């Protein structure tokens, strides 16, 4: 056994000598490695067995060998190694050696060679490489671990057990005392990192091992005791009794060194096995742990820096992203500059992203080296880096030993070192090792591991809860409590805070004034004052800022506001506020909803109120406007009707009726008309108008009873359109009882009349109507200027609607005493008559139609307008109209008149006179009825009124009176009309033909003339009656004269004025009124209205007596006036038979008319136009002034009647003489008649009668 150990020692020595010779010239660092290699040649030669043997022997022999080694050699080599080790540390330091070697093992063994070898090392690595495979694993650790000198322990390892028993204590004492100093010295240097201990064995092996081997081989026991003997005399002999065991007493000073040496020897081959470390002491492990910790600290620092860089880069990335969102915000496309900014932003983001990727990779590598446990020590780094992995932490904590083994055998983690050290302590049982630094490190490592595990477990949950990327959004639930505004978005809310509405609120908040530190300069009591300018103003920048009350932070713009609201500071502050006030959000939300609901209700209420107010205001305006339009305007059809109705109601009632009643009465009239006429609504307006026109145009006046009859349900609808419904209402109010009595008879008569009327209308009449329309339209401009109304509209209304309206107004005026049905029938008949007469007049005086048609049309339109305008002052109009027409047309009306027209006129005059004693009020109603025949008359009326009888005009009160005459004429004219009812149909047709050609009067015989004037005369008769009735009773006398005069003057004046005014107006009105309605009305109305018919017949036929009786009986009424006038006319004509006289009168008129066109139609037309213009001007100017004076007293004064009677009689006689002289055109000189007519018109104008009213009366 001893020999074997000796041989081993000798071999070791040789290896050591050879190595020493080679290493001495080289650098010490290389020598150490060579020494390591010398320590390992055995292992290399013996292979892995040698390594195992060295491990076995290291425990016992290592210690004795380290002591037996010559102190001088070890000291010298330690000293040399000291100076030379730093470079080896530099290259073999843990930075390069340990981890590089580990990396080299991982990374194909390149890095360690590069790092280890300057060129010298590279040269000598030839042997070292060949010798040491093991050093490659732990070779870099060898310099630190060589203090245990692995070569020395193996040789002693074998013989050590042999030497202890063989050689006793002597050898041990000798070498033990000698060897002790190097051990102490080596231990001193071993305390710093293991540099010195490894060097000692490297250099001490060659000298000492031979001695040790020789002595060890001879003296086994001494080496064991040698550990106890020291050069310094430290308890050398105390350890001797423990020859086979390591003395514990000496371990207090020496054991640390031994442990380091043994561990260093094991760490040289630390790869060999952990049990080697377990058997070794803890001191070498302390050095390893310290170095590992240092390296880890450095790596931790590096990783912390990288983590900080990552956090900064991420912040920059967020800023860039926010900026890009702001740049890209908005619907409008970005501008070129904005695009450039966006591109630059994208480029920067890409760069930062690349940097982040690289840095994160480096951090991953460091985590793999250091372990993720270290990350837990830096939670801030974890959060910033975002790579907290609790699972990995747990796995690391549990598998710390595995990770350390994987990283490197030498660079095992502190936990592994602590575990191994604890095992070694347990195995060795060294009590003194508890207070060693290794123990302390071990305990620290264990505690840190346990604490880390606990912290990892504790932090696992909160870290998981924080693993979210917060994305903020706008809840769009904003509310400015002070202003009561609900902005839609956060941006709108921030803008609202700067709006005037918010800035001008009553309460203003200034939280920034609280706790603000202005940092003013201190003030000293006795110090002098020094003036200093305020500087730095140029650095102030304006900003629409906001102040966060929670955070006490100023925010300069929207970008900063967005950043602040999304910041952790603001979120934390708000969370703290919520923690203090947990119900704040709920309360705020409920208050917001409540305020929103209140605001909505308030807004709705305001809107409703405003709408209601607007509606009310609009309704009031409409009502007022409607009332005003009804009273003043006549543009709209409805407004015209309403105004006519209102006017008719006020006029039909006492003249003192108020305007309010006018506004309401039309409605009442309409409502009353509805029950009266049940089928009115059912019938269409068009059919009603057509039927009414046909009935009016038809000579079927045999049934004039219908107008007198109350409302007939089937016809009334037609009448309603043709005749004004307001009239019905008035009639109903005045004569509802009569309507109820005669309603059945009226229905039958109305139906019969309509049936007869429709076929009566001929195509020639229709043509004439169309011609009249065209002429009126063409010549309407003049009339518009004079009457301020469109002639075309007047014509259209006349034929379509106007006739009905005017007739309605007339019938209203008449309706007071009449039944509704009577007014309707009369209106219809008046329309037909007026149209036919206008046509005939125009046809007769085609040569003069230029003057007639325009004048008539203008007068008609004027009369219509004047009627509506003058409805209030109807008394004046009525007086004026009958006067004018009475004087002109009385002779013709007496000879022949349509029954229907006469009856209508009679009834109208009677009803109006009854309803309103003042003839002026009743006249307006009469205006509309006689207007049909009067239109042409009034056109001529300007001149003819003067020509015929100025006195008659005056007596009648006004030229306007002729239109109203229909009501007064109704009685008288009806009587006259009764006479000539039979011939009216044929005669009317003849008259239409004659009028169309204009030559009818001269060519036709008396009968023919009678026929012509039957249609033409009914209006004159009505006018004559009205003229007489409308003025006071005196007008009839003058009316007769006017009548006598009328035919002559009418013819002449018509000739002068182209006979449009006088002959057509006189002839048509009078003839239509006298012949037709008298017969039919008297016959048919005997049952219904016997009084009216009888009175009319008596007044007409008996001449003066009947007229006087009628005038006396009806002096209060207008009918008396009309009757007296007609009677006077009849009396004047009674010298000859009434019929003959009428016929002759008609002949005279027709002859005059015929002669005039033959002589000079153009001249007469021109003269008439001139006279009409003059008359119109004079009328317009004078009528207003003289209306009250002359019109009112004239109709109302009965004493004037006799004067008029005388005048009318004289005029009638003159007219009779003139009638005989009619064939001679010179009988009525145009000039004298014109002068007369002009004077009459002037007087009428003075009375306040407008030519327009006259024209309207005649037109309709």
Curated annotation (Swiss-Prot):
Zinc-finger ranges (Matrin-type): 546-576
Chief location: nucleus
One Gene Ontology MF term: zinc ion binding
Biased composition (Pro residues): 148-158
Entry-annotated residues carrying Phosphoserine: 335, 697, 1197, 1228, 1232
Biased composition (Polar residues): 381-392, 672-686, 752-761
GO BP annotations listed: negative regulation of DNA-templated transcription; positive regulation of DNA-templated transcription
Basic residues: bias regions: 48-60, 117-130, 137-147, 618-641, 801-816, 838-873
Keyword Magnesium: no
Record keyword Manganese present: no
InterPro entries, sorted: Znf318-like
GO cellular component: nucleoplasm
Chain segments annotated as coiled-coil in the UniProt record: 285-366
PANTHER family in alphabetical order: ZINC FINGER CONTAINING PROTEIN (PTHR15577), ZINC FINGER PROTEIN 318 (PTHR15577:SF2)
Protein name stated in the entry: Zinc finger matrin-type protein CG9776
């Amino acid at each position: 056994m001893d020999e074997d150990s000796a041989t081993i020692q000798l071999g070791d020595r040789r290896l050591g000598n050879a190595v020493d010779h080679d290493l001495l010239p080289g650098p010490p660092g290389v020598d150490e490695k060579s020494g390591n290699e010398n320590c390992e040649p055995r292992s290399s030669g013996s292979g892995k067995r040698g390594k195992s043997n060295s491990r076995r022997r290291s425990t016992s022999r290592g210690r004795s060998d380290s002591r037996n080694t010559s102190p001088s050699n070890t000291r010298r080599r330690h000293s040399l190694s000291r100076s030379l080790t730093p470079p080896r540390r530099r290259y073999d330091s843990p930075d390069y050696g340990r981890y590089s070697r580990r990396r080299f093992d991982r990374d194909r063994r390149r890095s360690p060679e590069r790092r280890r070898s300057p060129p010298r090392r590279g040269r000598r690595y030839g042997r070292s490489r060949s010798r040491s495979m093991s050093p490659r694993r732990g070779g870099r650790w060898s310099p630190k671990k060589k203090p245990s000198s692995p070569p020395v322990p193996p040789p002693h390892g074998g013989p050590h057990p042999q030497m202890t028993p063989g050689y006793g204590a002597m050898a041990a004492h000798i070498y033990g005392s000698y060897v002790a100093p190097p051990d102490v010295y080596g231990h001193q240097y071993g305390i710093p990192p293991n540099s010195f201990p490894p060097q000692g064995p490297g250099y001490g092996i060659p000298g000492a091992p031979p001695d040790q081997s020789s002595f060890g081989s001879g003296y086994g026991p001494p080496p064991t005791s040698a550990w106890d003997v020291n050069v310094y005399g430290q308890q050398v002999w105390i350890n001797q009794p423990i020859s086979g065991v390591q003395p514990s007493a000496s371990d207090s000073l020496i054991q640390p060194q031994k442990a380091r040496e043994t561990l260093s020897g094991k760490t040289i081959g630390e790869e060999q096995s952990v049990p080697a470390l377990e058997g070794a002491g803890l001191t070498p492990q302390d050095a390893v742990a310290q170095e590992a910790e240092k390296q880890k600290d450095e790596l931790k620092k590096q990783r912390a820096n990288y983590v900080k860089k990552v956090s900064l880069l991420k912040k920059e990335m967020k800023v860039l992203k926010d900026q890009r969102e702001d740049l890209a915000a908005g619907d409008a496309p970005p501008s070129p500059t904005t695009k450039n900014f966006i591109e630059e932003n994208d480029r920067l983001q890409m760069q930062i992203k690349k940097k982040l990727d690289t840095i994160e990779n480096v951090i991953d590598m460091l985590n793999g080296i250091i372990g993720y446990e270290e990350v837990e020590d830096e939670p801030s780094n974890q959060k910033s880096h975002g790579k907290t992995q609790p699972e990995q932490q747990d796995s690391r904590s549990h598998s710390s030993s595995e990770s350390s083994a994987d990283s490197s055998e030498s660079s095992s983690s502190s936990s592994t070192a602590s575990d191994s050290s604890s095992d070694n302590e347990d195995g060795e049982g060294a009590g003194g090792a508890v207070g060693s630094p290794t123990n302390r490190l071990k305990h620290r490592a264990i505690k840190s591991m346990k604490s880390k595990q606990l912290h990892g477990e504790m932090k696992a949950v909160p870290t998981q809860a924080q693993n979210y990327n917060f994305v903020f959004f706008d809840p769009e639930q904003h509310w400015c409590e002070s202003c009561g505004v609900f902005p839609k978005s956060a941006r709108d809310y921030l803008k609202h805070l700067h709006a005037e509405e918010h800035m001008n609120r009553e309460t203003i908040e200034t939280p920034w004034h609280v706790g603000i530190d202005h940092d003013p300069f201190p003030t000293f009591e006795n110090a002098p004052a020094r003036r200093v300018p305020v500087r730095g103003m140029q650095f102030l920048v304006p900003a629409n800022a906001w102040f966060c009350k929670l955070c006490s932070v100023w925010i300069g713009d929207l970008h900063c506001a967005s950043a602040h609201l999304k910041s952790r500071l603001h979120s934390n502050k708000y969370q703290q506020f919520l923690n203090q006030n947990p119900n704040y959000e709920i309360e705020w939300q409920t208050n917001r909803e409540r305020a929103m609901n209140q605001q909505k209700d308030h807004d709705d209420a305001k809107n409703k109120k405003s709408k209601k107010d607007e509606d009310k205001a609009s309704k009031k305006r409409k009502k007022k406007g409607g009332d005003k339009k009804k009273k003043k305007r006549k543009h709209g059809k409805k407004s015209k009707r309403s105004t006519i109705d209102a006017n008719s109601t006020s006029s039909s009632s006492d003249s003192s009726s108020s305007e309010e009643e006018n506004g309401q009465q039309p409605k009442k009239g309409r409502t009353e008309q509805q029950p009266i006429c049940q089928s009115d609504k059912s019938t269409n307006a068009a059919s009603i108008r057509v039927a009414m026109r046909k009935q009016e145009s038809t000579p079927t006046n045999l049934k004039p009873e219908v107008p007198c009859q109350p409302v007939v349900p089937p016809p009334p609808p037609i009448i309603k359109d043709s005749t004004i419904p307001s009239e019905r209402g008035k009639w109903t109010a005045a004569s509802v009882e009569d309507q109820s009595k005669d309603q059945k008879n009226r229905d039958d008569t109305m139906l019969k009349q309509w049936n007869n009327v429709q076929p009566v209308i001929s195509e020639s009449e229709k043509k004439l109507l169309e011609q009249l329309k065209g002429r009126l339209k063409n010549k309407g401009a003049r009339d518009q200027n004079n009457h301020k109304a469109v002639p075309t509209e007047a014509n259209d209304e006349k034929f379509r609607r106007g006739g009905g309206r005017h007739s309605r107004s007339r019938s209203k005026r008449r309706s007071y005493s009449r039944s509704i049905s009577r007014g309707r029938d009369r209106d219809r008949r008046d329309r037909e008559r007026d149209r036919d007469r206008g046509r005939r007049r125009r046809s007769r005086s085609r040569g003069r139609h230029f003057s007639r048609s325009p004048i008539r049309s203008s007068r008609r339109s004027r009369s219509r307008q004047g009627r509506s305008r003058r409805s209030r002052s109807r008394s004046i109009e009525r007086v004026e109209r009958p006067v004018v027409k009475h004087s002109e047309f009385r002779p013709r009306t007496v000879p022949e008149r349509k029954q229907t027209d006469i009856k209508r006129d009679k009834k109208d005059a009677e009803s109006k006179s009854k309803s309103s004693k003042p003839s002026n009020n009743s006249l307006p109603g009469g205006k509309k009825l006689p207007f049909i025949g009067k239109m042409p008359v009034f056109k001529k009326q300007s001149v003819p009124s003067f020509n015929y009888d100025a006195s008659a005009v005056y007596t009648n009160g006004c030229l306007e009176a002729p239109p109203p005459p229909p009501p007064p004429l109704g009685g008288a004219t009806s009587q006259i009309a009764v006479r000539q009812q039979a011939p009216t149909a044929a005669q009317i047709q003849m008259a239409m033909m004659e009028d169309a050609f204009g030559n009818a009067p001269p060519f036709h015989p008396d009968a023919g003339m009678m026929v012509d004037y039957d249609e033409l005369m009914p209006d004159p008769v009505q006018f004559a009656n009205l003229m007489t009735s409308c003025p006071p009773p005196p007008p009839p006398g003058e009316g007769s004269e006017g009548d006598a005069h009328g035919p002559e003057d009418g013819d002449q004046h018509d000739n002068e004025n182209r006979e449009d005014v006088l002959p057509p107006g006189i002839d048509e009105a009078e003839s239509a009124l006298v012949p037709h309605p008298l017969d039919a009305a008297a016959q048919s109305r005997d049952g219904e209205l016997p009084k009216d018919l009888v009175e009319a017949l008596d007044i007409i036929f008996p001449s003066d007596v009947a007229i006087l009786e009628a005038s006396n009986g009806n002096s209060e009424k207008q009918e008396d006036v009309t009757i007296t006038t007609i009677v006077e006319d009849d009396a004047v004509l009674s010298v000859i038979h009434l019929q003959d006289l009428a016929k002759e009168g008609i002949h005279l008129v027709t002859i005059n008319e015929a002669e005039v066109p033959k002589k000079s139609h153009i001249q007469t037309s021109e003269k008439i136009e001139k006279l009409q213009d003059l008359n119109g001007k004079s009328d317009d100017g004078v009528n207003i002034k003289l209306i009250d004076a002359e019109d009112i007293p004239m109709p109302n004064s009965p004493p004037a009647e006799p004067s008029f009677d005388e005048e009318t009689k004289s005029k009638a006689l003159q007219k009779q003489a003139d009638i005989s002289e009619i064939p001679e055109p010179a009988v009525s000189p145009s000039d004298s008649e014109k002068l007369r007519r002009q004077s009459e018109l002037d007087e009428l104008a003075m009375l306040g009668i407008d030519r327009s009213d006259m024209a309207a009366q005649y037109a309709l």
